[in-house]
A protein has these predicted regions:
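RNA-binding accessory domains that recognize and position tRNA/RNA substrates
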Residues: 1-189, 202-246, 314, 362-363, ...
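Mid-to-C-terminal catalytic subdomains of enzymes
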Residues: 46-49, 289-304, 313-315, 325, ...
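Active-site adenylate/phosphate-handling loop in enzymes that bind or generate adenylated species
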Residues: 135-140, 173-185, 239, 264-330, ...
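Residues at the starts of beta-strands that form the adenosine-phosphate
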Residues: 187, 211-214, 246, 290, ...
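Short glycine/serine/threonine-rich phosphate/pyrophosphate-binding segments
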Residues: 197-202, 464-466
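A conserved beta-strand->alpha-helix junction
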Residues: 233-262, 349, 354
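Positively charged, proline/Ser/Thr-rich regional signature most characteristic
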Residues: 407-454
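Catalytic cysteine-centered active loop of the rhodanese-like fold, especially the PTP/DSP P-loop
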Residues: 442-485
Length: 485
C-alpha cells in the first residue's frame, strides 16, 4: 500500500474500449452520459469530489475519507474499462523535480526488488518519455537498496503520466466493469423472479448500458414479493444508482386461479408466461419502454424449447431480449456469485403457482390460440389495473411498511439476538448472540430452541424485517422480533 502523504486521492477512469471505436457523435454522447453518471454517483458520496473530463479519460479527486467507497462505485459503474489510483503532483517542470518526487513516494515499493519505470508524456517539455524513465530509474537505483532494473520481467513497474507540468504516479490499476454507460442504450423492462436467471439477465442489461426497470408477478405470498424487491434494490444500488428506475408489482394470484380453470394442464406453463408477457408489454408501452427481458435459457428446463419460446413471444408485438439464451446454468451461477446475487437467489422463498405434470415441449401454435380463446381475459385486465409502481429507491421502505414484526431496542428474558449480517462481524449485546447470515437463516432457524424468542439484527433493520417475514409466512414461526438497539 502506497503511503499517500497528500490528503486527497486521485482516480483516473479509462473508457471502455468499444466506446472509443464508435463514431464521433455516438462516442461524444456516451462519454457525456458517463460523465453525468459519475457526477451523480460522486455527489451521492460527497460534494467535495471533483471531476474533470478529458478526451481519453475522466479524473476524479476525492478527500481520502471517501476514497474507498468511491473506488468501489467506480468499479461497479458501466462504461469503465480501468480505474487507476494515482498520486498527483503539480509544478513538475524538470527531470530533477520528477525524480525526487517519484523516489519520495515509491522508494519503499522497490526495496529488495527489481523494478522498471514506464512513462507517458503530453506537453512541450524539452525532454522525452524515455528521458523520464532513464533519469528516474537511475536516481532510484542509486538511492535505494534494490535488486536492480529489469526492463522485461521487473517485480515492480512504476507507471508515470506527465501532462504538461502535472505528474501522476500510478499506484494501483483495477479492471473496471466494462460495457456502455448506463442510460446510453435506452430502457428495458426486466421480468424478475428473484432467482439466478432473472438477476443475472438484469445485471447484463445494466452493464450493456440499458436503464433496467423491474416487473414482478406475484403468484401468491408476501415473502416472495419482498425477496424480489430486496434483490432488485441490491442490483440497482450496486450497479445502476445513477438512474432512478421503477419496480412494478402485478398481483397474479387470480390469473393463476383462472389458468387452472380454463387451460389444459400441459399448456399451463406456456400460457402463464404468455399472460405475463401480455401484461408486461402493456406496462412497457405505458412507460414508453421499447423492449422486455427475461432470464430464459434454451433447454435449461424441458419447457424452454425454441418452439415454446416462440409460442411465448407470439403474445408480444414488442422486442423480447434473453441475454442468457445460450448460457449454461454453471456459467449463470458463476456470474451470480461474482455480482453478489447468488446468496439472494439461494435464500429466495420458493413458490410454484402453476405445476404442469406433463408440460408440452413442442407446443402447437394452433393449440395455443385455442387455449388462449378459452381464457377469461377480464381477470388479466383487472390484474394489470391493480399494478403497483414504486421508485426502486423506495421499495425497501415499502417492505418495512409491509412487515409486521415487532421492533425492540433491548434484550429481554428468554430472548436471543441473531446477527444476520453477511459480514463476519458479530454484534456485541447483552445476553447470547448467535451469528447466522441471512442466506442461512431459513435452514438454520428450524434447528433453534423453539421455546426462545429470537431478535433478528442487521444494520438498518431491513433484512431483519424481510427474513423475519419469510420465516413467519413460510414456517409459521411467531417467536421472532426485529432488534434495533
Amino acid at each position: 500500500m502506497i503511503e499517500n502523504k497528500i490528503k486527497t486521492q486521485k482516480f483516473i477512469v479509462k473508457y471502455f474500449t468499444e466506446i472509443m471505436i464508435k463514431g464521433d457523435r455516438a462516442k461524444r454522447q456516451m462519454l457525456s452520459q458517463l460523465l453525468m453518471n459519475l457526477q451523480k454517483i460522486s455527489k451521492d458520496i460527497s460534494n467535495e469530489i471533483v471531476l474533470k473530463k478529458f478526451f481519453d479519460k475522466i479524473e476524479l479527486v476525492t478527500p481520502l475519507e471517501f476514497s474507498s467507497v468511491l473506488k468501489e462505485k467506480l468499479l461497479q459503474t458501466p462504461g469503465i474499462d480501468q480505474v487507476l489510483e494515482a498520486i498527483q503532483i503539480n509544478e513538475m517542470d524538470s527531470l530533477d523535480k520528477i525524480k525526487v518526487e517519484v523516489n519520495k513516494y515509491m522508494s519503499k515499493e522497490i526495496a529488495d526488488k527489481t523494478f522498471v519505470i514506464r512513462a507517458k508524456r503530453v506537453g512541450t517539455q524539452d525532454f522525452k518519455s524515455i528521458d523520464i524513465e532513464q533519469t528516474v530509474g537511475g536516481y532510484m537505483l542509486a538511492h535505494n537498496k534494490t535488486k536492480g532494473v529489469d526492463l522485461r520481467n521487473a517485480e515492480v513497474t512504476i507507471k508515470l503520466e506527465l501532462e504538461h507540468n502535472k505528474l501522476n504516479i500510478i499506484t494501483q490499476k483495477h479492471q473496471g466493469l466494462g460495457g456502455f454507460p448506463l442510460g446510453s442504450q435506452g430502457e428495458i423492462l426486466s421480468l424478475m423472479s428473484g432467482g439466478f436467471d432473472s438477476t443475472v439477465a438484469s445485471y447484463l442489461s445494466i452493464k450493456r448500458g440499458l436503464k433496467t426497470h423491474f416487473i414482478f408477478f406475484n403468484l401468491g405470498g408476501i415473502a416472495h414479493e419482498i425477496g424480489v424487491k430486496q434483490v432488485s434494490w441490491y442490483l440497482w444500488n450496486k450497479f445502476a444508482s445513477s438512474h432512478r428506475v421503477s419496480f412494478i408489482t402485478i398481483p397474479f394470484e387470480d390469473v393463476v386461479g383462472q389458468i387452472f380453470k380454463d387451460i389444459s394442464p400441459s399448456y399451463m406453463g406456456v400460457m402463464l408466461k404468455r399472460l405475463m408477457i401480455i401484461a408486461a408489454q402493456k406496462v412497457a408501452k405505458d412507460m414508453k419502454i421499447d423492449a422486455l427481458m427475461t432470464g430464459e435459457s434454451v433447454a435449461q428446463v424441458s419447457s424452454q424449447t425454441l418452439r415454446n419460446l416462440s409460442l411465448i413471444d407470439s403474445a408480444s408485438d414488442i422486442l423480447i431480449l434473453r441475454p442468457l439464451a445460450m448460457m449454461s446454468k454453471p456459467d449463470i451461477i458463476e456470474i451470480a456469485t461474482k455480482i453478489g446475487t447468488k446468496k439472494f437467489a439461494e435464500a429466495m422463498p420458493e413458490y410454484c403457482g402453476v405445476i404442469s405434470q406433463h408440460p408440452v415441449t413442442a407446443g402447437s401454435f394452433d393449440r395455443v390460440e385455442k387455449e388462449a380463446k378459452n381464457f377469461d381475459y377480464t381477470i388479466l385486465e383487472e390484474a394489470i389495473k391493480n399494478a403497483k409502481i414504486k421508485n426502486i429507491d423506495e421499495v425497501l421502505d415499502d417492505v418495512c411498511e409491509v412487515g409486521t414484526l415487532e421492533v425492540v431496542n433491548s434484550v429481554g428474558e428468554n430472548e436471543i439476538v441473531v446477527d444476520i449480517r453477511q459480514s463476519s462481524d458479530i454484534l456485541k449485546a447483552s445476553g447470547e448472540v448467535l451469528k447466522i447470515p441471512f442466506y442461512d437463516l431459513k435452514k438454520e432457524f428450524k434447528k433453534l430452541d423453539s421455546s426462545k424468542t429470537y431478535l433478528l439484527y442487521c444494520d438498518k433493520g431491513v433484512l431483519s424485517q424481510l427474513h423475519g417475514q419469510y420465516l413467519k409466512d413460510e414456517g409459521k414461526y411467531t417467536n421472532i422480533k426485529v432488534f434495533r438497539p
